Amino acid sequence: MRQAGHAAAEILLEVGARVAPGVTTDQLDEVAHEATLACGGYPSPLNYRGYPKSVCTSVNEVICHGIPDSRPLVEGDIVNVDVTIYLDGVHGDTSATLAVGEVGEQDRCLIVETRVAMDQGIDAAGPGRPVNVIGRAIERHALRHRLGVVEEFIGHGIGTEFHSAIQVPHYYNPGANTVLVPGMTFTVEPMLTLGSPECAPLWDDKWTAVTRDGRRT
């Protein structure tokens, strides 16, 4: 798992270095695809439940599962790149939200505080603790910075399966009381918003999730 996670992180760095105005998310997908193969792995999203690309690229108001396409990124956009590699029998998953050129102060705050919220959620986890301590830490930080917490999409178990049984809400859910034990592997991937955390219906592609109010995430 550590090797797969490290490989995913290296791929994300390579893709992130290419993020710039005028670059298309299709081009980012191509970079990720080739980098994944160069590692000796396979891009986990490709053909997963019909998903057509090797990474997810979620721009501006897209919460998650954005499908790369031919539209160029423009100055001031923000884009989340979500990389997962299948390597040596297990999946490694990581993502980051990146600024395209210069972005506004609100967008910088969103990027920074979402990362801090994720780190605080990770720090809260530990053997013998219920999984809901993760969401409690994330939600507390988000609300302190007046950011919305998307509830429809949550972290998940990962390992030999891309998505396994454990569920990791990014908000405090008393019912999420699975006790964490050594050896568990799961994702912590909070999706925070500048406005309402409510989701609009999925796009016609059946993947792309966006904020109902069109605010950035």
Residue ranges of predicted features:
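Active-site neighborhoods and metal-handling regions in enzymes and metal-associated proteins
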Residues: 2-217
